[in-house]
A protein has these predicted regions:
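Aromatic "clamp/platform" in nucleotide-sugar-dependent glycosyltransferases that forms part
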Residues: 230, 249
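A conserved, positively charged/aromatic
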Residues: 87-121
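A conserved mid-protein helix/loop that constitutes part of the nucleotide-sugar donor-binding site
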Residues: 2-10, 166, 170-189, 199, ...
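A short, well-ordered alpha-helix in the C-terminal region of glycosyltransferases
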Residues: 85, 157, 295, 302, ...
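A short helix/loop element that forms part of the nucleotide-sugar donor recognition site in Leloir-type
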Residues: 149-161, 214
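A conserved nucleotide-sugar
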Residues: 16-18, 162-166, 180, 184-226
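Conserved acidic donor-binding segment of nucleotide-sugar-dependent glycosyltransferases
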Residues: 281-282, 286-293, 302-307
Length: 349
């Protein structure tokens, strides 16, 4: 969420809008936004005492600033800031839903905000099913900031792999729902007859990281399945892959698929959440049912055994991300601006 908020604020400011933030005092965004030149108001929101103080503080900030729009991003800040905005008379209150998991109480979507934005159509459709009117919720995809092209990845040198080895890579935090074991189980049947095939995981997270290490050791495939842990040079590592695959079981959107396509990689993803919206099935990648090892194995085999298909899908994905700019910060700002103007006009009625 923090990355999305920072990119959105930066992109909206670039279009000439005045943007300020209200954060908890110890929030990670405080320093980052301040360093970027944004005004950041620090308001404590924990506990019942701070709830009342928070409503009063935010109301004062909104009245003094005469803001047109308040955008909230979690239940707590919606309950406090949206109520404050109602009291301050802020014209438009928008709640953003970042996650795909089930929502308990819908109060912070249907009562406090005037409108809702989501990170994928999948999440939008879920909220509509739960009672948010369709005309009051819009999808605004999360953007990625494209890194400079990588001339040569260090991945293969680090792992001792040859240029003609085939590397299937996955970048994801190590959680059970990310499907690391599913990906292992799908690729292992292909390894015996393909001695140059390797699987690389990038990402950390206990206890799944250690459990995955143990599972790989049990299979005796430590020289074919590589766990690199958390890395800060993901674009460098993506440039060393031949195929990107993530067998996630739950995902609101999945911008890592976009990052992989930006690197010119064909992608394999599971048909859950908003994943199908992140790439074009059959054109830039292959979509498979979740928890279906055979389908995942078949998709992997198609791309592993067909270099021409890899190149064709990789080129199409790179074009979609770089030339069409579907997931650029500028596109996010354009979409956000459009829905805000539309909703402000409706509210002014």
């Amino acid at each position: 969420q923090e990355g999305r908020i920072f990119k959105e604020m930066t992109a909206m400011r670039a279009r000439g809008h005045h943007i300020e933030a209200i954060c908890q005092p110890r929030a990670l965004l405080v320093e980052r936004l301040s360093d970027a030149g944004f005004t950041v108001h620090k308001v404590a929101m924990d506990g019942p005492v701070n709830y009342l103080k928070g409503v009063a503080a935010v109301r004062g900030i909104l009245k003094e600033g005469r803001f047109d729009v308040l955008n909230t991003h979690s239940r707590r800040d919606t309950v406090i800031a949206a109520l404050a905005a109602r009291l301050a008379g802020t014209p438009l209150i928008v709640r953003t839903r970042h996650l795909s998991n089930k929502v308990g109480s819908m109060w912070s979507y249907t009562c406090l905000p005037h409108r809702v934005t989501t990170v994928s159509d999948h999440v939008r459709e879920y909220l509509i099913e739960r009672g948010v009117p369709a005309n009051k919720v819009a999808t605004v995809y999360s953007p990625i900031v494209l890194p400079p092209p990588v001339e040569r990845s260090t991945l293969r040198d680090e792992l001792g792999l040859a240029d003609d080895d085939i590397v299937v890579g996955c970048v994801a935090v190590m959680r059970a729902t990310k499907g690391h074991k599913d990906l292992i189980d799908a690729i292992v049947p292909l390894m015996a007859s393909r001695p140059k095939l390797h699987l690389v995981f990038v990402g950390g997270g206990s206890p799944v990281f250690e459990q995955t290490q143990d599972y790989v050791a049990t299979l005796g495939l430590q020289d074919r399945i590589h766990l690199m842990g958390m890395r800060r040079d993901v674009p460098n590592l993506l440039a060393g892959f031949d195929v990107f695959a993530l067998a996630t079981q739950q995902e609101a959107s999945g911008t890592v698929y976009v990052e992989a396509q930006a690197s010119g990689l064909p992608v394999i993803g599971t048909d859950v959440g908003g994943v199908s919206e992140m790439f074009r099935n059959g054109e830039t990648g292959i979509l498979v049912p979740p928890k279906n090892p055979q389908a995942l194995t078949e998709a992997l085999q198609r791309l592993i055994d067909d270099p021409a298909l890899r190149r064709r899908m990789g080129d199409a994905g790179r074009k979609m991300v770089w030339e069409e700019a579907v997931f650029s910060p500028a596109r996010l700002a354009e979409t956000t601006e459009a829905v805000y103007w539309k909703w402000l006009a409706e509210r002014a009625g």
